[in-house]
Amino acid sequence: MHEGMMWGRIAAGSSWYTFPDDEMTSLRDVAEHAGVSVATAWRVTHGADSVRPETRERVELAMRELLYVPATRPEATGAIGLLLPEFANPVFAALAQAMETYATRSGLATILCNTAGSALREVGYVHMLLERRVERMAFICAEVTDVRSDHAHYQQLIDRGARLVFVNGASEALEATSVGVDERAAGRIATEHLLELGHTRIGFVAGDAFALPTREKTIGRDDALRAAGIEPNGYVAHGPFTVEGGRTAMSALLDEHAADPPTGVICSNDLMAIGVLQEAVARGLRVPDELSVVGFDGIDAGGWTQPPLTTIEQPIDVIAKTAIAALSSELDDPDLALANYVFRPRLRLGGTTAAPPLRKAARRAPGRARAAPR
């Protein structure tokens, strides 16, 4: 190991993958990491047959772990790598489609990479992109959003001069462009909407507790509650960012607070909100008469529920356009290339929110109090 070199690690089961924190990895680094001579490492990188399979495997593993790319490849291509955690999530698909459209208009090809939410798979795709001299990459809701993660592989990309954009997820530890929605404002706007309707027991069906967007929405919700004179309560349940995750979290929330259930719920995304609606139906709760629900994202499927979902809509098209501009030659100014673009979401009213049951009863009370004439 070179003197003064710093190392970062990420875990995968019982394995640790190591990345140097310095500038572009040299062939000597690969040789040392694999425990072979530089000459042997050179033969592997140039496809020579005179290397034992087990030795070749060690060298190739070192190349992947160190993001090493032989310097004999062609120059950088006019393409971008677009890495997202899954294709099934409608908002990821919408972002990818919009970004591909704007990339094409900018003369850039797009290579889509499904990381399946795996840091190691993400690193594998990064290495594949670098091998093909793709030096511009956009990460949608990537591993960087996990506050527990070691972000060393992103830093290494930055050190080697790659142009990165983080979409809907960033890290304060990295000097890179980020483009996304104001998650804290989203949590605040959703909560304020329910407060204005008269709700005070406002739950949060939240995604992964270690995801930065979840933490930001939590802060926004708590800020809105405190501003209304309500101390943030324990009406919070976490689950995966899926329909089933939302339903399971809502079930846990209702079971935990059976004696005093929430009358309104905000959700980390629209998929989770749809799961909340399913759980409400299963329990015989009428939406919005007995339970109000607010989602986040503004996906088309939110308009297909009955009643249509009230949600906090993020500006997908603007986010996509800005992200591609940051990756293209339109933003060669270093100051602009490191900017953070944060866009405010907006409330989109559907039919899943209304005044809480007690407020409705109070409104009807005067009429019921009058005695009918005899």
Where do the PLM segments sit?
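Proline-centered loop/turn at the N-terminus of a beta-strand
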Residues: 109, 135-136, 161-165, 177, ...
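N-terminal helix-turn-helix/winged-helix DNA-binding helices
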Residues: 17-24, 63-97, 106, 116, ...
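Flexible loop/turn connectors
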Residues: 2, 7, 13, 27, ...
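Short beta-strand-centered segments that line the small-molecule binding cleft or hinge
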Residues: 123-134, 138, 144-185
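N-terminal helix-turn-helix DNA-binding module of bacterial transcription factors
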Residues: 1-77, 357, 362-374
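Hinge/beta->alpha junction and helix N-cap segments in small-molecule ligand-binding domains
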Residues: 54, 84-94, 112-121, 143-147, ...
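Short acidic/polar active-site loop segments enriched in Thr and Asp
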Residues: 135, 200-201, 263
